[in-house]
Regions:
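Glycine-rich phosphate-binding loop of ATP-dependent small-molecule kinases
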Residues: 1-214
């Protein structure tokens, strides 16, 4: 079972990807993680990617797909995998699709965790973090006992730049321009499954499993 996770930043797709991977005992593959692993291990593909990254350039889609195919060819992927963070654009999806087709392979499901923008903004701008011990909170859902203070270590909590409302809105704009078209791409291939991501995490997960096992 080869699965791609789609959804806006903050939709919870990373959490769901991990839960799916745990249930089916298949790898949860993040392109960021495999880039780092290849660079750390000094592989030829990793060094090629590092050359682009060191110059502040984006790694070309063809190279990203090569690194990805190298990962999914490993023994632990023989029963499937969950892809998280790739593809993000139509050109990336097309390169991946072409490469998989040449291997007589394909994506079985694209799960779109659908959450309206206003919910995403509320979710992300309500996050608070402790830089000292790494604990995370949410002012509405998981508030600290004392406002602005970490329960665990007593340090001050901060709103990370990534979670500021303006940053979140900018990320959503990029998502709608670049990644939203993937929904049409995978709908046309007959593999897209839409799931309401506004519900409780376990309910979202149960609905995803129902789609995968229908």
């Amino acid at each position: 079972m080869k699965i791609i996770m789609l959804g806006a930043p903050g939709a919870g797709k990373g959490t769901q990807a991990k839960m799916i991977a745990d249930k089916y005992v298949i790898p949860h593959i993040s392109t960021g993680d495999i880039f780092r692993a290849n660079i750390k291990n000094g592989t030829a593909l990793g060094m090629e990617a590092k050359g682009y990254m060191d110059q502040g350039m984006l790694v070309p889609d063809e190279l990203t797909v090569k690194i990805l195919l190298d990962r999914v060819a490993q023994e632990d992927c023989k029963n499937g995998y969950v892809l998280d963070g790739f593809p993000r654009t139509i050109p990336q999806a097309e390169v991946l699709d072409k490469a998989l087709t040449e291997l007589n392979d394909k994506i079985d499901f694209a799960i779109n965790v659908d959450v309206p923008d206003e919910n995403i903004i509320r979710r992300m701008s309500g996050r608070r973090a402790c830089l000292n011990c790494g604990a995370t909170y949410h002012i509405a859902h998981v508030p600290p006992k004392t406002e602005g203070i970490c329960d665990r270590c007593g340090n001050e909590l901060i709103l990370r730049d990534d979670d500021k409302e303006e940053t979140v809105k900018n990320r959503l704009t990029v998502y709608h321009e670049q990644t939203q078209p993937l929904i049409d791409f995978y709908t046309a291939k007959g593999v897209l499954k839409d799931v309401d991501g506004t519900q409780d995490m376990q309910v979202v997960f149960d609905n995803i499993i129902a789609c995968l096992e229908a």
